[in-house]
Amino acid sequence: FDVNSHTTPCGPVTCSGAQMCEVDKCVCSDLHCKVKCEHGFKKDDNGCEYACICADAPQ
């Protein structure tokens, strides 16, 4: 699953798949799931969590 291929146009900007558009501004999505991830959920460059996508182990 390529998280970078799921983006949303939002006025003059584009939101990542971990964000939603609110009045031409990207904000972290409030979607959650019950998956347990050993290293937490994957985050975008803004710190927003992707729902149900586990983060890789720290290097």
From Swiss-Prot:
InterPro entries: Antistasin-like, Hirudin/antistatin. Residues 28-54 form the Antistasin-like domain. Disulfide bonds join C10-C21, C15-C26, C28-C48, C33-C52, C37-C54. It comes from the Eukaryota. One of its GO terms (molecular function) is serine-type endopeptidase inhibitor activity. GO terms for cellular component: extracellular region. Its main location: secreted. It is found in: Secreted. The keyword Secreted applies. Keywords: Disulfide bond, Protease inhibitor, Secreted, Serine protease inhibitor. The record marks K34, V35 as: Reactive bond. Belongs to the protease inhibitor I15 (antistasin) family. Strong inhibitor of mammalian trypsin, plasmin and acrosin. This is Bdellastasin. It comes from Hirudo medicinalis.
